[in-house]
Amino acid sequence: MSKAKLDDSTQRPLYGERIIEESKIICFDNPNKKRIYEISIQLPEFTCKCPFSGYPDFAKLSIIYQPNLKVYELKSLKLYINSFRDIKISHEEVVNRIMDDLVNEGSPHWIHLNAAFNPRGNVSMQLDIFSGQKKN
């Protein structure tokens, strides 16, 4: 069992906003490196802020990937995704940043990130980004 990160000032475990602020994507070894398989992760409560109005934007993120040597640890991924909650950033920029971080940390054979943003002002938006070569 791993030890929880401690707040330097209080020596209490980091919780809530403080642990989200320090979040990063963590990976662990792929338990079956010889097998080609896909993992699908759904993150239905993504939020960030519009860089122009400051209003919140909501999206459902879907990640499908074929792991190479590493797989993503889900709690760290959740906290990393939650870290965008108060950041003013465009849809295009945030989805590309998330994809860059996923590729840099996990180096999957292939990955697809879909972001389906909720309608605002009668306009909805969906972004799809791919990286790598899908293996059969």
Curated annotation (Swiss-Prot):
Known catalytic reactions: 7-aminomethyl-7-carbaguanine + 2 NADP(+) = 7-cyano-7-deazaguanine + 2 NADPH + 3 H(+)
GO BP terms in the entry: queuosine biosynthetic process; tRNA modification
Pfam families noted in UniProt: QueF
A GO cellular-component term linked to this record: cytoplasm
Main location: cytoplasm
Active site positions: C50, D57
This enzyme's EC code(s): 1.7.1.13
Name this protein carries in UniProt: NADPH-dependent 7-cyano-7-deazaguanine reductase
Native source species: Prochlorococcus marinus (strain MIT 9301)
